[in-house]
Regions:
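Positively charged n-region of N-terminal signal peptides that target proteins for export
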Residues: 1-4
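Bacterial N-terminal signal peptides
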Residues: 7-14
Length: 139
């Protein structure tokens, strides 16, 4: 957990403010070399305080991503074909794993996180914290 915290802190220090629409991908790595890239700019929030957060797995998932697909070919959630919802948090956070396809027709996994946590305004800190909670359980 300490490694995750240090890496995410370093990434946040290098980030410009997330108020613009341009994607700001924060990379979080664990001891096994697996990485999650979090888009801190693409965070939506409704009047009810429901946060929608996007991130993408930048390592290969053998059962769903062909070995020929490089992490650099990862794409945003564009064409939705199948999904899996994982209820894993007491704070009603839902993880949705979506398989999408890049321009070459290769399947890639993109992750969406919906949280009913009590954040008034999403910040890079809260975004990374939510992803770290999920990553520590599932990576």
């Amino acid at each position: 957990m300490r490694v995750w915290s240090l890496l995410s802190l370093f990434a946040l220090l290098c980030l410009p403010p997330s108020s613009t629409a341009q994607a700001r991908w924060v990379t979080i790595s664990n001891e096994n070399g697996q990485r999650i890239e979090v888009d801190t700019a693409d965070v939506g929030i409704t009047g009810s305080g429901h946060i929608t957060l996007w991130w993408r797995l930048s390592y290969r998932v053998p059962h769903s991503i062909p070995s020929s697909v490089s992490p650099t070919t990862m794409v945003r959630w564009s064409s939705m074909t199948e999904h899996e919802e994982i209820n894993c948090h007491e704070d009603e956070t839902r993880i949705i794993q979506q398989t999408s396809y890049n321009a070459a027709g290769d399947a890639v996994d993109v992750i969406k996180l919906d949280s009913l946590s009590s954040f008034d305004t999403p910040t890079p800190d809260s975004v990374v914290e939510l992803v770290m909670q999920w990553a520590c359980k599932h990576l």
